[in-house]
Structure formats: structure tokens, C-alpha cells
A protein has these predicted regions:
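Metallocofactor- and cofactor-centric catalytic cores in central/energy metabolism, strongly enriched
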Residues: 5-9, 23-210, 226-230, 248, ...
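Conserved anion/nucleotide-ligand pocket segment
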Residues: 240-286
């Protein structure tokens, strides 16, 4: 475990140049990335590239919406037009890492962002240094307390009244210890350094203690415990979700809708998708692709074979979604939300355990996206009221 970066990056002009709904300009927001692997380095390099106006932030629902297409042609407007999100230029970027590293070296090592772009961003990325310091602590509770102190120092140094931690490190596939039903159970598990405590759970506890919102980019069974959502609720900060969705999830749902509209029955399907939580998984489906294969039943006993291949780097998609989740989480915090943010389930494979069991997420991804968009005006009004009261 390492100390947080306490150096503010060099900011570009921001991404608010064509936006209809302006955020809280001039108010710094801390964004601390845990892990400078493929996803973590892509988050930081992408933000720096976008706010330096070197690239357009394609892939981000908040910044780019439906890939530039007009709504009447199947596109969607950027979420930023519906609510006062923080500007990319107002993000103070930080990182945690196990060894001494910086965002420039991490981006070169990952190799997902083009070398020419990374070199052009070298001054900004070199400033984002994750301090080494896998510290010796008697228990993981003491470690969480130390990390929380680093987060407070980061916020104070950069003048950030709010912040979000985005954890990209892989978590537990399944729990091996007892379930955590309350914050008391969680702190007891941290004190005992039990098997049910993952690294992400330590960072989550630190974030809650320091007053930061939390986004778990990778799946982690430890973070699905009811105690985690309750901990963030008690700390008055939001907990976004666990395990960012890959685009193949949306593709499968779209294909299913087409098959339903054409009265084709799905007989069987095979997915060769690489698990997103594998930190070294550079691409979908083995070396260079994901392949989705299915068999659809047709008229008179016939069938159609459906095969879809997607080529690309999964970390770039997850980086864009992580930025979306962080900006939504910060907006929720500004609007006075805390605990499980089930309305953000459209971005995640697992919605955090809600306080109300009946508050189940919508069934389809489309319904969840509609719920997220419907929540934005409510958040915008609450954030505005909060700023006026302050």
C-alpha cells in the first residue's frame, strides 16, 4: 500500500467549452486512482489529453454522449448537458501504488495510449507521482486509518472540499470469511485482518473515513457486503458500485432485442469474454478480440448462427466509464446523497447493497440508463440548492 500523491497536475482549459449546464467552476475536486495499471494509467492519461484539447473524450457518457450522433439518429446527448458536473479542468489528480511510480511511466508501460500522445503529455503525467510506501501496519484497520490520513492531506494540499477514490485493483472472486452485515463487522474484520478483507475494502474504508466517494472499477465480492454501503451512508458520502460493465454487455442486450423483434428464439450462446478484473488483460478474448457466439431458432426447424467479434482494448472503455462514475459520484455528493447509489447501476455489473431491499435495479441495461438520466435533474436541483445554502 502506498501514500497518496500530493501534487496538483497541470490543467488545460477544461471540457466545458460547449456545455449547456455549467458546474461549480473553480472548485477543485480530488480524483485519486488506486493502482497505476492498465485502467488506472488510462484514466489519468485520458483526462490530461482531454483537458489539454489533444483528443475528444469519446467513450464517456458524461463528456461525449452518443458518439456525436444527433438524438433523432440514435445518438444521445452528453450527460453533462443535464446536470452541473465538475469540469475535467477542476480535477486534482492523485494516485496510490505499491511502488514508486508516476503516470507517465505507467502509461508507457501499459501501452494502451499512443506513445506520441503520452510523450506530448509528459510534463503533466510526470507530475502525477504515486509515492512508494507499502507501509508496515499492525492491522489492516491501522492501514486504512493511515491511508485516510493521506487522503485528507491530499484534499488539504489541493484545496478540494470533495473527492472520489477510483479503485482499479482486482478483488476477491468469492468470500472466504464470514459475511459483513454492519460497519462494526467491517471494522472488526479489518482489525483481525481476516480473509474477507481485500485491498479494495481497505481503500474503501479509508475513503469513507476521509469523506471521499468511492468507485470500484473491478469486481470484488468483499465490496458487495451490506456493511460497505452502510459504512458510506454513515459517513455521508456516496458509494457508486462494483465492477464496471464492458461494452459486450450492451451488445448482448441489443442483439437479444433484435432477436425478440424478429421472433427468433435463442437456443444457446457462448461468451469468450476476458474477465475485466484481470489487471494484465490488455484486450478482449485472448490476444486481440472478444467473440460472442449464439444460435437462434428459426422457421420450420431452421436456425441462424450469430457470431460477433469486437476488437479493442478493454482498459480504455473501463477508463472512460470510471471517469463517468467518478463525476456522477461527485455530483451525488454535492447533492447530499450518501451510501449506495443504486441509480448508477447502469454502469456496473453489481449495484451496491441498498438499505431498502425492495429498491431493486431495473432489469435491462436500457431501463437502467433511463433511470440514471431521470435522476440527473433531481441531482442538479439538489446540488444547486446546496450551493445556494452554502
Amino acid at each position: 500500500m502506498a501514500r497518496a500523491l500530493q501534487i496538483r497536475g497541470t490543467f488545460g482549459a477544461g471540457s466545458e467549452r460547449s456545455l449547456g449546464c455549467k458546474g461549480a467552476e473553480g472548485v477543485m475536486v480530488g480524483l485519486v486512482v488506486v493502482g497505476l495499471g492498465d485502467v488506472g494509467s488510462s484514466i489519468l492519461a485520458g483526462i490530461e489529453a482531454a483537458r489539454a484539447h489533444l483528443v475528444h473524450p469519446w467513450g464517456s457518457l458524461v463528456e461525449a454522449g452518443g458518439a456525436g450522433r444527433k438524438p433523432e439518429h440514435g445518438g444521445s446527448q452528453p450527460l453533462r448537458l443535464a446536470a452541473p458536473f465538475a469540469n475535467l479542468s477542476d480535477l486534482a489528480l492523485g494516485a496510490f501504488e505499491l511502488k514508486e511510480d508516476d503516470a507517465y511511466r505507467a502509461a508507457l508501460r501499459a501501452g494502451h495510449v499512443s506513445r506520441s500522445l503520452v510523450d506530448e503529455l509528459r510534463p503533466q503525467l510526470r507530475h502525477i507521482r504515486a509515492m512508494s510506501g507499502a507501509r508496515q501496519a499492525p492491522t489492516r484497520r491501522h492501514l486504512a486509518d493511515a491511508l485516510a490520513e493521506d487522503l485528507r492531506g491530499f484534499a488539504e494540499h489541493n484545496g478540494c472540499p470533495r473527492g472520489v477514490v477510483v479503485c482499479t485493483v482486482p478483488g476477491l472472486r468469492e468470500l472466504s470469511g464470514k459475511p459483513l452485515f454492519s460497519p462494526v463487522d467491517l471494522w472488526d474484520a479489518l482489525e483481525a485482518s481476516g480473509p474477507e478483507v481485500s485491498p479494495a475494502l481497505v481503500y474503501a474504508a479509508a475513503a469513507a473515513r476521509a469523506g471521499y466517494g468511492f468507485v470500484a472499477a473491478a469486481p470484488d465480492a468483499a465490496l458487495e457486503a451490506p456493511a460497505v454501503a452502510e459504512l458510506f451512508g454513515n459517513s455521508d458520502v456516496p458509494f457508486a458500485g462494483v465492477g464496471l460493465l464492458s461494452p459486450d454487455a450492451a451488445l448482448r442486450e441489443a442483439l437479444q432485442q433484435v432477436m425478440d423483434s424478429e421472433a427468433l428464439g435463442l437456443v444457446g450462446a457462448t461468451s469468450l469474454t476476458t474477465r475485466a478484473e484481470e489487471r494484465g488483460a490488455r484486450l478482449w478474448g485472448g490476444p486481440d478480440r472478444t467473440e460472442e457466439m449464439g444460435l437462434a431458432a428459426a422457421w420450420a426447424g431452421g436456425s441462424f448462427e450469430i457470431s460477433v467479434q469486437m476488437r479493442g482494448q478493454i482498459s480504455l472503455h473501463h477508463a472512460a466509464r470510471a471517469v463517468d462514475a467518478a463525476l456522477l459520484c461527485e455530483l451525488a455528493q454535492r447533492a447530499g446523497r450518501s451510501g449506495a447509489q443504486t441509480w448508477m447501476s447502469a454502469l456496473f455489473a453489481t449495484s451496491p447493497a441498498a438499505a431498502s431491499p425492495h429498491d431493486a435495479p431495473a432489469a435491462t441495461l436500457r431501463e437502467r440508463r433511463e433511470r440514471l438520466r431521470a435522476e440527473l435533474p433531481v441531482l442538479a436541483a439538489a446540488a444547486l440548492a446546496s450551493s445556494q445554502a452554502a
